Each structure stands twice: as C-alpha cells, then as structure tokens.
Amino acid sequence: MTDRIGTQCYGLHKEFDEDFRGTLSRIAAIGLDCVEPYLMLQEEQGKTPKDRWSYSLLREAKQQLDELGVSIPSAHIGAGFMSFTMPREKITEGILRVHEIAGISNYVFSGMFSGPRGAGKWGRLLHDVSGDVRPYGCTVVYHNHDDEWKRIRRGSDTLRALDCFYEYAGPDVMLELDMGWAAFAWDELQAAQAYRDRIVMMHCRDFAKEAMSGRYHRVTMPASMYVPVGDGEVKVREVIGMRRDMPHFNGNLIIEQEKSTRGMLADIEVSCRRIRGWLQEEAGTDAAICR
C-alpha cells in the first residue's frame, strides 16, 4: 500500500471560479498526490460553480492533472442528499461515464441521514448501484458527516444510523471515514476501530477546540472553527496510524478543509506538510525497528 495525500475540491469555490487551471497547478505545487473532485452528472458546466465538475470540466482537469503528475483515484458524486436522490439508473450511467472518461475507481456518496428511513433508502440505493458498477471495477463508498453517528431505537435496542445503513447496503459498500465529523458527533478513534473493515479512504479534517464544545451545529459552524490538520482537537495523527489495521484501506488520505479564514490553499498546504511529516516520522521509526 502506498500512502497518497490529496485534497477534496468542493471547498475550493472561489479558487476554481477565479482561476481553474492555476488552482490545479497550485495543488500540484503544494505537493499533493491526488484530488477528490465533486462531480455533477451533466455534460456541460454551464453556470455550475467550478468546484463541482461536469463531464467536460473533468476531461479538462484530467488532462492537466496527468501532466502535473496528480491522480484522481476517487470522486464524490452529487446524487442527492437526505430524502432526495437521483434514480439508480442515472447514477449508474453517470459512474460508468466517469469511469470511461477518467478511470476513477472509487465513487463516494453522502446521504446525511440520521434515522431508519433515510438509512434504509440510501442503503438500498447504494447496494443496487454497487451491484451495477462492481463488474466494471468500480467501488461505491459512503462518506459520513455527523448525523450518521446518531443512535436510533429499534425495538428494545439502539444502533447507530450508519449501522442501520450498512444492514441495507451490504458488504460491498465501503466507507470513507471523515474523522472530523466522527470526532464532532462521537469519537474518531472508536469510529475508526469499529469500521476498520469498511474503511477504504479517510478524510483528514480538524476542528478548533471551541467547535467541540457543543455550541455549534454542522450547518452553523463558522469558518474560524475549520483549522489545518494538527492545529485542532481531532486526533488525526492517531487515526492515520490505525490504517494498517484496515484491510481494505487503499492509501488515500484526503485533506478536508471545506472553509478557512486564512486562505483555503494556504491551510491545505499546512495540512499536507504536516501529514507528510507524520508519515516520514512513521517510516523512520519502522526502519529503526527493522534494524
């Protein structure tokens, strides 16, 4: 397994709209190995902000990123949220189209459900989509926020909404652990341990101490609470250190900045340097043990 440090693209609203190609070049200059774009299943960009890529913008980005040596191993698919979802057939068609254009293997979805109805709806949908696309070498992956960690009652028992989702989704739908939201709603170390057999990628997100005080909701979280990895309260380094016990982990460590008061790319660069340093320290320790 080769570790790759990347960034999600959805938070780079202003940067991509102002200078799309320049922002891709800056991502490479920072030293990132990969990106995870947010894809809209539509041919033309039109008036859609450029942090959400159409097929045509994906083609343009793929060509430039190939030249820069930056890969696209995963993509977040804009297929709906909460109770709204695109039809299964449209999602499947879109994934296969993207796979043909860019060769992406991992397709990430977020439903943001907190109850059994939403968990069941998204679980059934992604179970079916996974069955459609697995023969083509594509993996369907779920990305958590905070809602999915809520406990729901079923008879005399309780379980987390994410567990309910996976009962419907089946064994082939994997997890992209957003450790920041896991920490915000539950415990990032416990989440990584509990779902280690599902995790294929991780989103490295950090929050300031005040964000964890119970004062904020995800929707009301101000930009000042989103800090570079290692500057906040989330145990990002410790969770990264657990990846070797995750049998399906593919090496992708995706920086999830989302908002910033200091500058998105500047914060992403800090996070990249910090994670790279941790990995180098870990490799040095391993080498010393081997000697």
Residue locations for each model-derived region?
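Active-site beta-loop-alpha junctions enriched in small/polar residues
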Residues: 8-12, 38-42, 77-82, 111-114, ...
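Hydrophobic faces of well-ordered beta-strands that scaffold small-molecule active sites
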Residues: 3-9, 35-37, 72-77, 107-109, ...
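N-terminal pre-domain/capping segments
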Residues: 1-105, 197, 273, 277-291
